[in-house]
Amino acid sequence: MAPLQFQPLASQPTPAFWAALAAHKLNHLKLDDSHLPITAQIEPAKRVLINKERVDDTADVGIDGSLVVGGDAFEAERGRLPPNAVSVTGTLKIFNTIEEFKDTSAKKRLFDDLVSQMLESFDTDRPVLNPFLLVTFADLKKYVYHYWFAFPALVSSPAWVMDGEFMPVDEIEDIRKLAQSHFQHNTTAFLLKGAAPHLSAAPLSSCSTFYDKTQSEMVTVVFHDTSSLPSNPGWGLRNVLYYLSAKHGITSLVVICLREGSSSTQASLSLSSPPSTAPAKPPQAVGWERHPSGKLSPRVADLGPMMDPTRLAAQAVDLNLKLIKWRLLPALDLDKISGTRCLLLGAGTLGCYVARILMGWGVRNITLVDSSTVSYSNPVRQPLFTFSDCLNGGLPKAPTAAKKLQEIFPGVNAQGVVLGIPMPGHPISSSDDAVEKDVAKLEALVKSHDAVFLLMDSRESRWLPTVLGRKWGKVVVNAALGFDSFLVMRHGAGAGAGARRIQSDEGGVGEKGLGCYYCNDIVAPTDSLSDRTLDQMCTVTRPGVAPIAAAMAVELLISVLQHPLGVHAPAERPDTAETSTSTKTSPLGCVPHQLRGQMYQWKTQIVEGEAFDRCTGCSDYVLNEYETNGFAFLRRVFNEKDYLEKVTGLDELYRESEKVIEGMEGLDWDSEGEE
């Protein structure tokens, strides 16, 4: 009599599983390649009726069950399973390189270890009869997954044979209800005895005590069958038969193959010959899943063509950033970076480069503000514009730059606002309501963003955003260019609790806090745009200075965001950051106040500057005056050249200095005192 043949189990990993695997590898496992448990479900076979060419002509077609691995494979608590599905646990091994995945010895070790664990479980009351192994290599850049499933099955010797044919089961619905009430999707096979309506069930480990030996009760096994073939049960029965024979001495039994609908069958099985009395040898195990071509080889799942291109781009952008956390900076908070809303005042050379680098860091919300249009000289220096943007008078810079950002990466929320920024020393009409609306719009923009970049091409245009940024406690990063020099700095946040923690004895900047762009000035900002020659009106700089300054400006912001004190982070130098024992540091290193670069000398200096209590941009005099009088204060600043100096007391300070100088005019600095 021919040995009983079994239908191999088929794997069915879903796209949701591969997405969950990619996220788990990228965000949690990283370089950890130790194996881990996952859950799946075994779905039984079923038979369906399909219509042929004639209406009255139908065919009964069998559909095999499978092992379905879904998106919840890594979750401890699984969702609701289909009515006749069974939950099983397996082992997942994600290799870090394709070479490791191709190593056959590594896969053999994993398979043998799983077989050993299964055999050890036979000595417990919870034998593991349906383990599975999944080895894979995930190419997360291309969304290609190389994988191979194994369903270890122990080879019974002697083999099992059928005593007759497989027959339909009359009491199948009673058996199905019994399985659901007793085992609740947790077992693939169980023992059965009695007749309807007095059926009873027990786990396989109770085989020695469940049946009455005096009555010669036949052992009956019910198992969830994944095979739709009439005379070949599913792969999972192999381990059940081996376990009952090896651990409980069963040589004959009745098996009920539980399938969907009315297609379940039953048959009597027995060993083809008496078991050997020779010392037991380790059983042989088989079970690697074959490729659809019939070969014993891995499979490949390529999800790239299936994914939405926009979502694909978003995941690809995040991939490089998340890889930083694998080995280099595990403490990097990428969510804080991506959630930061950035306002870029100026969409010229600096604005274009800053926007691109912010996108590289994963920033998703960028608003650009500019009032000018694209000119023919812009595209070669401003990478978001092309020649076509210059035609017919030129497109507005801010909306055009925002559109180009979305073309580069559709996942970015980029907005462009055409807005002129009122400036000190640039008079306005007393009835000019448009300026007041511009101020209100600018203040609303500053208020609704987390970080503000000052990237304009004049000194006085930075004044109003400086005041607004200080008022609303925003991170303000300023970048300014010379011919072969640049300044990148962050504005201080005032004398808050965080700002007062700046070290003074160890080389810090004292307790006044960090200064702003105007804290070193002893005169108010005024009109610097009028009465200029052509070389003064155009931005004349070495072309490489702007991208260097833009990169430093963005990196300074990111370092501030990663610091525990955020906008209140103290000014640090590389030497003090390395020797500091404080835990309140940025994982990206020291967070300086100012960076002053000189291309002529190839030098970048770290500078610290205290807040000036009479500063025209961030002092309490200015903030209180704006808080009290609002736009009326601003109108006087725009129209009256010396008004800011009066508000802050700089004029009085200047007069006092003049008196001191006048009082020193009669002194003879060259004479020496007599002893």
Curated annotation (Swiss-Prot):
Pfam families xref list: ATG7_N (PF16420), ThiF (PF00899)
Main subcellular location of this protein, as a coarse class: cytoplasm
Cell compartment(s), UniProt: Cytoplasm; Preautophagosomal structure
GO biological process, one term: protein modification by small protein conjugation
UniProt cross-references to InterPro entries, sorted A to Z: Atg7, Atg7_N, Atg7_N_1, Atg7_N_2, ThiF/MoeB/HesA, ThiF_NAD_FAD-bd, Ubiquitin-activating_enz
Domain of life (superkingdom): Eukaryota
A GO CC term attached to the entry: extrinsic component of phagophore assembly site membrane
One Gene Ontology term of the molecular function aspect: identical protein binding
Chain segments annotated as transmembrane: none
Active site: 538
Record key words, sorted: Autophagy, Cytoplasm, Protein transport, Transport, Ubl conjugation pathway
Motif (GXGXXG motif) on chain: 346-351
Region (Disordered): 268-293
Keyword Transport belongs to the record: yes
CDD domains (UniProt xref): Apg7
NCBIfam families noted in UniProt: E1_like_apg7
Subunit-level organization: Homodimer.
Functional description taken from the UniProt entry: E1-like activating enzyme involved in the 2 ubiquitin-like systems required for cytoplasm to vacuole transport (Cvt) and autophagy. Activates ATG12 for its conjugation with ATG5 and ATG8 for its conjugation with phosphatidylethanolamine. Both systems are needed for the ATG8 association to Cvt vesicles and autophagosomes membranes. Autophagy is essential for maintenance of amino acid levels and protein synthesis under nitrogen starvation.
Domain remarks in the Swiss-Prot or TrEMBL record: The GxGxxG motif is important for the function, possibly through binding with ATP.
Similarity comment: Belongs to the ATG7 family.
UniProt protein name: Ubiquitin-like modifier-activating enzyme ATG7
Organism for this UniProt entry: Cryptococcus neoformans var. neoformans serotype D (strain JEC21 / ATCC MYA-565) (Filobasidiella neoformans)
